[in-house]
C-alpha cells in the first residue's frame, strides 16, 4: 500500500538516498531542508521529489515523518510534530525497521563505507533485483527486491537499530572526536554492532582493532596477508585500475579487475567478493560486474578543464587523505600531485592535527582552505588552519575562495580537492579561473 512520507532534512546524504528509494517503490515522497544548495538535491529534483523550505504547513496528519539526525527540537517542523503529538522516526530507526523485509547486506567502518556500499550495490543489482542506499545520496528501491544493501554509520552509534544478515566492517579508526572519547570507545561501538549481525561478518584482517571484535556470527577476515580467510594476491596496479586474484582456504575463487585506484579499493573489492562468495553468488558474475563499476559521488570524481585534471574527493580524515593521494599517484604516476584540503570541524582538526600534517605530506604541494565548522559546534578560537600549515613539511599555503590563482603555479599537475565541507566552492573558483584563461588565450 502506498504511503506519503515527509523528510525533515531531505538533503542529507542518507536521507536523500532513502527518499529516492521510497519514491521508486511507489510511495509519495516530499521533504524540507535549508535553502543552501547541496549536491544530493540534483537527484531528488530529477526524480520530481518536492523540496520545501521548513514550515509547519508542510506537515499533515496522514504523513509518515522521517527526521534527519542533525535536526532537533529547535527545528520548527520537529517542534510542531512534538507539540501536536504527531509521531516521527529518526532516519536510523526507520531504516532498522525497513530492512526487516529483505536479506540485508550492511557496510560499516570508519573509512570506505560509501565506496564499498556502492561497489556491492552495483554488483548485486546487476545480478538480481536489489534495493540499496548509498551514503553519496544515491538510492534505488524495488518492491520485488529480495536483497537490500546499505551503509551503516557509527556516528552517535546510529547503527545500533540495525540487525543485518551480513555486514562488512572495513576498518576501525578514531574519528568524530565530538562524540567518541577515544579508540576504545569506537571499538566498543563496533563490537556492540557486530553482535547484532545474523549470518556473517567480513572484517579487514590487518586492522588490530578489528581483530578484537567478537560476535556470535562467523567472522571472515580479508586482506593481503596469509592467515586471512580471503586473500587478495598477484596484484597489478596500472593506470587503468587494479587486477588481482582472491583465494579462500587455499583455493583460487577468481581473478578480478576493478577500474579503481589505490590499495584501499582492492581491499574494498575483496570484502565485497568475500561477502558474495559466502552468500552463494556466482563468482564469474561478480567478476563481470566489478569491471563496470564507475564509482560513487565525491569519491575520486574526475573532470578535465582546459587540459587540467581535477579530482574531487570527500576525504576528511588523515587515513582517507593518504588513500586518495595513493590513488592519484597510481593513475597519474608522472604528474605532480597538488592537494587542496579543507579541514572539517574544529574538534577533528584539534584531535588529529599532527596526523593531518603527515597525511598531507604525501602530496607534492599543499593548499589549505579555512576550517569548515560543523553546525553542532562553536569556534572557540582553539585552532586555525594556519596551525596546520605550520606543521606541513611540503610547500604549503592558505588560499581563499576569492583567490585560488596560486594553484596556477604548477605544470603537469593533478589537482586533488579534498574535504567534507564546502571545498567544492574552491574547486568551482579554480574551474572558472581555468575557463577564463582559455577564453583569454583564444
From Swiss-Prot:
InterPro entries according to UniProt: Mur-like_cat_sf (IPR036565), Mur_ligase_C (IPR004101), Mur_ligase_C_dom_sf (IPR036615), Mur_ligase_cen (IPR013221), Mur_ligase_N (IPR000713), MurCDEF_pg_biosynth (IPR050061), UDP-N-AcMur_Ala_ligase_MurC (IPR005758)
Annotated S-S bridges: none
Enzyme class: ligase
Keywords annotated in UniProt: ATP-binding, Cell cycle, Cell division, Cell shape, Cell wall biogenesis/degradation, Cytoplasm, Ligase, Nucleotide-binding, Peptidoglycan synthesis
A single BP term in Gene Ontology: peptidoglycan biosynthetic process
Catalytic activity: UDP-N-acetyl-alpha-D-muramate + L-alanine + ATP = UDP-N-acetyl-alpha-D-muramoyl-L-alanine + ADP + phosphate + H(+)
Residue positions binding ATP: 109-115
Gene Ontology molecular-function annotations: ATP binding; UDP-N-acetylmuramate-L-alanine ligase activity
Primary localization: cytoplasm
EC number: 6.3.2.8
Any one Gene Ontology cellular component term annotated for this protein: cytoplasm
Protein name: UDP-N-acetylmuramate--L-alanine ligase
Lineage, uppermost ranks: Bacteria, Bacillati, Bacillota, Bacilli, Lactobacillales
